[in-house]
């Protein structure tokens, strides 16, 4: 966030093996969050709004996260079951408080409050190896809820000039409760001329959504979304806080990758694309595309140079207009190069 430069991670894991079975446990005494871009001029991707630390509702209870999984090895692959209980990696809009100076409401401020939903995940996965082909798949059910209730909102002080805006007049916690699922299917095979092909299909959808409303009368700014109050249906701006990062962009996507190595794997070329195929409310079969071309050259055993170009294309005719995620990201198209040295 804007006031923080680093976020620690502490976790532990235990794996137990018995014949063709594997049982694993994970535990973390702290909440591990996703690395969102900071407001740095040299970083090409930025959020339109940068929440400050005091705009977040702190997790009042102990933010313990834990999970376990079990897998069985088969003759041509494996199957697994996973469970996780913790907090979302991405923050969400938790609600809004309206403050003023004493009883005078003529100069009030809207305090947008963010938080992290409590999430439980139950998933299954499999890997199958058939000849030169590999099939991978996973599906997961997510139950997530915003644990910030009315009492927590009433206890909050204004995040902006609390000595002046010292009186809370209105409080609107969203209290989201959502059930959703995610599914990923992946196919890998070696094509002629030693070209590695990877194809992936991703989809997610909400199964059930409940929340309170936000009866506001002026426009507000929310990270990743500029929206008017008339359009501010909390269900419309719901974004999964856990699972595949593709879920932030679209509900349905196809990913294709081709990779070729030459000169004894010293030089590698990779062409990949992400296609938004969520076209239920749009005539264009592929509203947006992210295309990436990368090459990597190993100068010696320790030194590697990478060069890449990414082009992001949205659709000006998309029903969401400028709010369509890939339209927002078009300016993030970029050329990059980096030098890696391994000790």
Regions picked out by a protein language model, each given a short descriptive name:
Residues 3-88:
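Aromatic- and glycine-enriched pocket-lining scaffold segments that form the walls
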Residues 6-10, 62-66, 118-122, 129, ...:
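Residues that define the transmembrane beta-barrel architecture of outer-membrane proteins
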Residues 20-23, 76-79, 132-136, 194-198, ...:
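Repeated loop/turn-to-beta-strand initiation elements of outer-membrane beta-barrel proteins
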Residues 41-51, 91-114, 147-175, 209-243, ...:
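Solvent-exposed loop segments that connect transmembrane elements
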Residues 327-343:
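Outer-membrane beta-barrel "beta-signal"
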